[in-house]
C-alpha cells in the first residue's frame, strides 16, 4: 500500500517508530499532487518549499521524542482560511493578490502541532455554491467521475482527500459545504456545533452559520482532527467556553440501545432511488449493531431552504461590503472617482453567483422588506431549531440522506439556481439549528458514484455521532474504496 493511501492514525505509528520520515511522506504527497491535480484541480496554491522545510522540522521533533498527534502529517486547507505569508483568495478575483499578515486560530492550532501544510484548496467563490463551479480558478472535478461535480463549497477539500493528495483537510460548512462534498467524493466530513471551533481567521460568508470542520479518510481521523482544532477562543465572540472531550476515546463505546431518529420529512417521494436503497441498508446495519430506529418529525424542514437563502445572503451582503479595492485585494483604477472605483472593482472582482447573493441579501435587508423577509426568516429559524431540540427529547441521533441525488454532471444545474440551491435541502437545517452533523460513506449509486449517510447530533453531541459513525464504519468497508485515478 502506498504511503498516500494511509490514514493519520496509521501514519502516526510509522512516524513515531521512525519507519518513515515526514520529509519522505510529504514528498510522496507532493508527487501525488503533481501526478493528479491537472485532472482534478483541487489546489489553488501549493506550498512545496515551505512544506518540505516544515517536514524537516517535524522530523527533528519526532527524533527528540516530543511529537504531537499531527506532527509530520501532510494536510491541506480550504482557501478560506487566513494563512500568514501564503496567498488566500477565497477563490475570488477580488482577493487574487491577498497575502495575509497572520494565521487564523484553526490553522495556528494545526501548525502548533507541527502539521505540514501542503497548500490551499479550491472552493466555490466566498463559499457560495454547491458544486465548486463558481471558482475564479476553475472547476474542481470529482475524482470518482471527472464529468461530475465534487460538491461545494468545500469541493477542493473533499476531492483532495478522495484523490489521496493529502491525508486530511479542513473545510467550512455554512449550509452543507463540508457534508455534501464529503458525500459526493466518498470521504468523511463533519460540521461541528456552532461555536465549537473558532472562526477567527476564516473569511466570513454568513457569520451566524459558518463553521470549521475536518474532511478525512475515516471516522477515527475525523475525531482526531476535530480534537486538534476544537476549543474556546477569546478572539471569536461566538466561541463557546466548554471543555473539549476526547473524541477518539468515545469511538469504541458501541451503539447498543442508541435511539436513531428517522425524520419522515427527509424520506419523501422524489428521493433518488439509489440514495433511498443505500440509506435503508445503512439503517438495517445500524439495527443489527443494536441501535433502535424511531420515526420522528421535523415539521418546518420545507421552509429551510427559503429561510437559509434570506439569512445567509443578508449576512453575506454585509460581510462582503469590505471588499472595495482600497484596503486589500484587486483594484480597478479606471474609475472617474472613489465611488466609481468601488463599483468597478467589485463588478470585476466578484463572480456572478456572489453578485446574485449580495443582491438577494441587500433586498432582504432593505427598509421596505426587512420585516416581510429577513425578520420572518429569523422566526422560522427559531422554529427549525426547536424542531431538532424536540426530536432529541426522543432520540440520541438523527439519520438522513446527505443529498437528494449523487454527484450530478458539470453544468447540469448552473442555468437553474433554484435547483442548485435545493442540492443542500437535507444539510441546511443543521446549520440553521446550530447543531452538529456529519457525512459517512455508505455505498455507491448504480453508476459508481459515492453516497453519504448524514448523522445529526444534539448541540455539542459530536461524541455521539462519531461513535455511531465509527460503529457503522467498522461493520462496512465503504471507506476503504479508492477513487479510480
Swiss-Prot record:
One Gene Ontology MF term = glutaminyl-tRNA synthase (glutamine-hydrolyzing) activity
Among InterPro entries, the record links this protein to: Amidase, Amidase_CS, Amidase_dom, AS_sf, GatA
Q: What is the main EC category here?
A: ligase
Q: What is its EC number?
A: 6.3.5.7
Return the similarity comment: Belongs to the amidase family. GatA subfamily.
Task: Name the HAMAP family for this protein.
Answer: GatA (MF_00120)
Can you say what this protein is called?
Glutamyl-tRNA(Gln) amidotransferase subunit A
